[in-house]
């Protein structure tokens, strides 16, 4: 979801809020506003649209979480041929990759985790109705270890459940891609859950730690992104196992193994090999690398040889100018020199 679209949603809700103040009819106005907004959001499945209409306060948070996932995806792949861009259908989760590749696996995992993270944070901050701090982490005292639950523990289970209900609702086709997407959604949420942190505060006389009050907090989303990038690098190719009677996809097993071994719950899985992402290709969703910045001297993925797929690169020269060697003179002005530097950038042909 683009930032301008998110702002549009916010301003529409704001306008309906002003209308409510003037008319004094909250329920009907909110319902009308939710219907208008939810019908305008591209790519929503019927169940997602129903959730949007019943929980209009949550749709902005969902959008923030989806955008957080997209931003993290772009950060993790900023130096690769594929930079988290696609030519697929526009949805609240960005443009979808048409190929069931390891890149698609990452995008599903990171956006599912992003929605769970954003919803959990909004609940802890009191920005969503029907949720708050984790009630199960209140009042317990561990006398042996000298600590008790206190403060506001993030209710990550609520965030995960909400992400599961909303994000997974777009999987309506009964095929192998559905099983792949659902597995990767769950893997992203599981990585988030496993990285929850315990923070404690000491209580006692003169700085001693007679007792501790502890609570759980969300990890930084960058940490989740790094972990999922590692999962992407070790992604597992799978194939579908079909039921004997209806021949419908039943579960996924690791490909090239004789046994029916299922992937681990935190594995990212894919069913199709990745394209090379060198050229624009509507069939795969690849946008190609033409015009991408590259590093002429790097031997890595961001190097011009790799990034440009052997097509060569263009050199662009420009002069960078800035204020430098600034000194304060009494009294009272600052005098600076003007420095300049000739700079080159390289883009793929």
From Swiss-Prot:
<dbReference type="InterPro" id="IPR013300">
    <property type="entry name" value="Wnt7"/>
</dbReference>
<dbReference type="GO" id="GO:0001649">
    <property type="term" value="P:osteoblast differentiation"/>
</dbReference>
<dbReference type="GO" id="GO:1902379">
    <property type="term" value="F:chemoattractant activity involved in axon guidance"/>
</dbReference>
<comment type="function">
    <text>Ligand for members of the frizzled family of seven transmembrane receptors that functions in the canonical Wnt/beta-catenin signaling pathway. Required for normal fusion of the chorion and the allantois during placenta development. Required for central nervous system (CNS) angiogenesis and blood-brain barrier regulation.</text>
</comment>
<dbReference type="Pfam" id="PF00110">
    <property type="entry name" value="wnt"/>
</dbReference>
<dbReference type="GO" id="GO:0008284">
    <property type="term" value="P:positive regulation of cell population proliferation"/>
</dbReference>
<dbReference type="GO" id="GO:0001944">
    <property type="term" value="P:vasculature development"/>
</dbReference>
<dbReference type="GO" id="GO:0072054">
    <property type="term" value="P:renal outer medulla development"/>
</dbReference>
<dbReference type="GO" id="GO:0001701">
    <property type="term" value="P:in utero embryonic development"/>
</dbReference>
<dbReference type="GO" id="GO:0003338">
    <property type="term" value="P:metanephros morphogenesis"/>
</dbReference>
<dbReference type="GO" id="GO:0021846">
    <property type="term" value="P:cell proliferation in forebrain"/>
</dbReference>
<dbReference type="GO" id="GO:0042475">
    <property type="term" value="P:odontogenesis of dentin-containing tooth"/>
</dbReference>
<dbReference type="InterPro" id="IPR005817">
    <property type="entry name" value="Wnt"/>
</dbReference>
<dbReference type="GO" id="GO:0022009">
    <property type="term" value="P:central nervous system vasculogenesis"/>
</dbReference>
<dbReference type="GO" id="GO:0051145">
    <property type="term" value="P:smooth muscle cell differentiation"/>
</dbReference>
<dbReference type="GO" id="GO:0060484">
    <property type="term" value="P:lung-associated mesenchyme development"/>
</dbReference>
<dbReference type="GO" id="GO:0045669">
    <property type="term" value="P:positive regulation of osteoblast differentiation"/>
</dbReference>
<dbReference type="GO" id="GO:0005788">
    <property type="term" value="C:endoplasmic reticulum lumen"/>
</dbReference>
<dbReference type="GO" id="GO:0042592">
    <property type="term" value="P:homeostatic process"/>
</dbReference>
<dbReference type="GO" id="GO:0036516">
    <property type="term" value="P:chemoattraction of dopaminergic neuron axon"/>
</dbReference>
<feature type="disulfide bond">
    <location>
        <begin position="200"/>
        <end position="214"/>
    </location>
</feature>
<keyword id="KW-1015">Disulfide bond</keyword>
<keyword id="KW-0964">Secreted</keyword>
<dbReference type="GO" id="GO:0030324">
    <property type="term" value="P:lung development"/>
</dbReference>
<dbReference type="GO" id="GO:0005109">
    <property type="term" value="F:frizzled binding"/>
</dbReference>
<feature type="glycosylation site" description="N-linked (GlcNAc...) asparagine">
    <location>
        <position position="295"/>
    </location>
</feature>
<dbReference type="GO" id="GO:0072060">
    <property type="term" value="P:outer medullary collecting duct development"/>
</dbReference>
<dbReference type="GO" id="GO:0021871">
    <property type="term" value="P:forebrain regionalization"/>
</dbReference>
<feature type="disulfide bond">
    <location>
        <begin position="326"/>
        <end position="336"/>
    </location>
</feature>
<feature type="disulfide bond">
    <location>
        <begin position="133"/>
        <end position="152"/>
    </location>
</feature>
<keyword id="KW-0879">Wnt signaling pathway</keyword>
<feature type="lipid moiety-binding region" description="O-palmitoleoyl serine; by PORCN">
    <location>
        <position position="206"/>
    </location>
</feature>
<feature type="glycosylation site" description="N-linked (GlcNAc...) asparagine">
    <location>
        <position position="127"/>
    </location>
</feature>
<dbReference type="GO" id="GO:0060710">
    <property type="term" value="P:chorio-allantoic fusion"/>
</dbReference>
<dbReference type="GO" id="GO:0001525">
    <property type="term" value="P:angiogenesis"/>
</dbReference>
<dbReference type="GO" id="GO:0060428">
    <property type="term" value="P:lung epithelium development"/>
</dbReference>
<comment type="similarity">
    <text>Belongs to the Wnt family.</text>
</comment>
<dbReference type="GO" id="GO:0032364">
    <property type="term" value="P:intracellular oxygen homeostasis"/>
</dbReference>
<dbReference type="GO" id="GO:0048018">
    <property type="term" value="F:receptor ligand activity"/>
</dbReference>
<dbReference type="GO" id="GO:0060535">
    <property type="term" value="P:trachea cartilage morphogenesis"/>
</dbReference>
<feature type="region of interest" description="Disordered linker">
    <location>
        <begin position="238"/>
        <end position="266"/>
    </location>
</feature>
<dbReference type="GO" id="GO:1902262">
    <property type="term" value="P:apoptotic process involved in blood vessel morphogenesis"/>
</dbReference>
């Amino acid at each position: 979801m683009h930032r301008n679209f998110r702002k549009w949603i916010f301003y529409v809700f704001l306008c309906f809020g002003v209308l409510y103040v003037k008319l004094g009819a909250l329920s009907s106005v909110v319902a009308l506003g939710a219907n208008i907004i939810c019908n305008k959001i591209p790519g929503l499945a019927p169940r997602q649209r129903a959730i949007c209409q019943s929980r209009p306060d949550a749709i902005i948070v969902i959008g923030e979480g989806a955008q957080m996932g997209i931003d993290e995806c772009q950060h993790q792949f900023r130096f690769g041929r594929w930079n988290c861009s696609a030519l697929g259908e526009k949805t609240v989760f960005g443009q979808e990759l048409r190929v069931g590749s390891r890149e698609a696996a990452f995008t599903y995992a990171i956006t599912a985790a992003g929605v769970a993270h954003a919803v959990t944070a909004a609940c802890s901050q009191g920005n969503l109705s029907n949720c708050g701090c984790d009630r199960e982490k209140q009042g317990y005292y561990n006398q042996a270890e000298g600590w008790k639950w206190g403060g506001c523990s993030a209710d990550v289970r609520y965030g995960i459940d909400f992400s599961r209900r909303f994000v997974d609702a777009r999987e309506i086709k009964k095929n192998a891609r559905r099983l792949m997407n659902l597995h990767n959604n769950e893997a992203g949420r599981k990585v988030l859950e496993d990285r929850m942190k315990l923070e404690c505060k000491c209580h006692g006389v003169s700085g001693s730690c007679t007792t501790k009050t502890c609570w759980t907090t969300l990890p930084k989303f960058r940490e989740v992104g790094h972990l999922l990038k590692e999962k992407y690098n070790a992604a597992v190719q799978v194939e579908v196992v079909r039921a004997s009677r209806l021949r419908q996809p039943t579960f996924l097993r690791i490909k090239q193994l004789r046994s029916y071994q299922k992937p681990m719950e935190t594995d990212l899985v894919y069913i199709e090999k990745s394209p090379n992402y060198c050229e624009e290709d509507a069939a795969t969703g690849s946008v190609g690398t033409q015009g991408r910045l590259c590093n002429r001297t790097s031997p890595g993925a961001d190097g011009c040889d790799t990034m440009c797929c052997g097509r060569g690169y263009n050199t662009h020269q420009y002069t960078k100018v800035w204020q430098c060697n600034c000194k304060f003179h009494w009294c009272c002005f600052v005098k600076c020199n003007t420095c300049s530097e000739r700079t080159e950038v390289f883009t793929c042909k």
